[in-house]
Amino acid sequence: MNKEKLRNIAIIAHVDHGKTTLVDKLLQQSGTLDRKNMATERIMDSNDQERERGITILAKNTAINWKDHRINIVDTPGHADFGEEVERVLSMVESVLLLVDAVYGPMPQTRFVTQKAFEKGLNPILVINKVDRPEARPHWVLDQVFELFDNLGATDEQLDFTVIYASAINGLAGHEPDELAEDMTPLLDMITEKVAAPDVDQNAPFRMQISALDSNSYVGVIGIGRITGGSVKPNDRVVVVDKSGIERKAKILQVLGHHGLERVETDEAKAGDIVCITGIEALNISDTLCDPDHIKPLPPLSVDEPTVSMVFQVNDSPFCGKEGKYVTSRNIKDRLEQELIHNVALRVEEGESPDQFKVSGRGELHLSVLIETMRRENYELAVSKPQVIQKEVGEEIHEPYEIVVIDIQEEHQGAIMEEMGHRKADLQSLVITENGRMRLEFMAPSRGLIGFRSQFLTLTSGSGILTSVFDHYGLAKKGDIATRQNGVMVSMIAGKTLAYALFNLQNRGRMFVGHGLEIYKGQIVGLHSRDNDLPVNPTKAKQLTNIRAAGTDENLILTPHIQH
């Protein structure tokens, strides 16, 4: 395709601001989606965990044909823990669509990804979404975004950004919040007008950098990236240059383009287009594919350093091997090595013993997604509690700090301020917003935030919004942070849990187990309401005598136990 008719754009948004919904509507209204896919909501979230958590973890590519233009859209993760995905995506596009909620305005993750976009010199198009909500305040949000851009050091050109107002769920967009068009046409037209065509030479020798990887059982590894020069056809011979500069010869089997959500085989792809390449084994992210006669590798893509680590090890509890299919250290090691191929922000090192592996990532969420993925794939493993990664600078110890933005009702302010004080956080700003809510901004050490989210929801009765993003490494704060106020209930006997015992124990705290589950001696079965640990017997049955007949029991009602 002629590069003048090509547009490459990435969508940036905070978690749950409607990014994937917006892409769905663009696909439907441009006529790119066929009927069978129209019933599925959030089509771009293809992974089970993405649909359940309501977040995007992996960057997706899709293409829309609009009038005589072809628009390549890349959906980026909104969470800073997946920052390495964002980094690579931005190397493939000429502009970004910044999507902001019309109620909450820009959030920390918006700040994180926008900063990355400005560093790459990209000009944003601002989309203020959810303007149909009764509490929407689009003009306030616009001021907040302008202030954010200014704080991030945007150039005059970047500050002169275009604004579109939208209601993605209803499939409407317009130039004014109270004058939306019948469909998404204003947004699609804006993309074709304002986004520059790729600055590439289609007659130069072929060159392409791998920005993402996929695989399937038929063709093996699939390399995804943007062609930065020349053109490519199936069966072309190329030279692969890795980030260390080592060269090897290879042959391309297929060239796949995008049409909607489908990958379609193409006879030729030219510079500026985002394509998938198959047939080359052992591809890695950052590898450059070059014309054999003109070998000029592109600079390797940079990735943020990990900040949190956990130990993965073989499950050595008395119940080992009962639930999982893959239980040995060899299974765990192979799976982690497989994950390293496409999860480039992950680090895996040997642990203190042969069956332990130290796994480091960008944050709690990054590692929890990996653990949950492995659990669903039938891996059985034990994990340690998360530890932050500290650095030595000269003779000083530095630790990671995060910006934490908390949006709560005013009556919860005292409890939150007290708890953040215990976690060694410093208050940076406090703004009272409309409807009796307030926004607090803290600078907190990462170790103080581990395990805080569930407690935060309890303190705010589920009405608070907590977001955090890595900011910098700074001087470590002295002293330990007490992350757990409660003691635990520990089983002093092995056996099966019984409702009678649990009914009497639930007054002492929250249970982790329900009725009829096998437990072992020493297993933690609940949270104690006080700060000391309590040995308990969850297997105790009711003593039956002639005086106390089984039929005269009171009705035992168990409070639902905490499930992980």
Language-model features: where?
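P-loop NTPase switch module centered on the Walker A-proximal segment
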Residues: 1-100, 104-106, 144, 213-216
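Canonical P-loop GTPase G-domain recognition
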Residues: 123, 133-193
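A short beta-strand-to-loop transition that corresponds to the Sensor-1 phosphate-sensing loop
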Residues: 102, 128-130, 137, 168-169, ...
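Flexible, glycine-rich loop/tail regions that form catalytic "lids" or insertion modules at the edges
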Residues: 209, 216-217, 485-486
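Conserved P-loop NTPase nucleotide-binding/switch module
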Residues: 86-100, 105-149
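Accessory interaction regions appended to the cores of large information-processing enzymes
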Residues: 142, 160-162, 182, 189-193, ...
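Residue-level signature of catalytic and energy-coupling elements of molecular machines
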Residues: 16, 22, 54, 73-75, ...
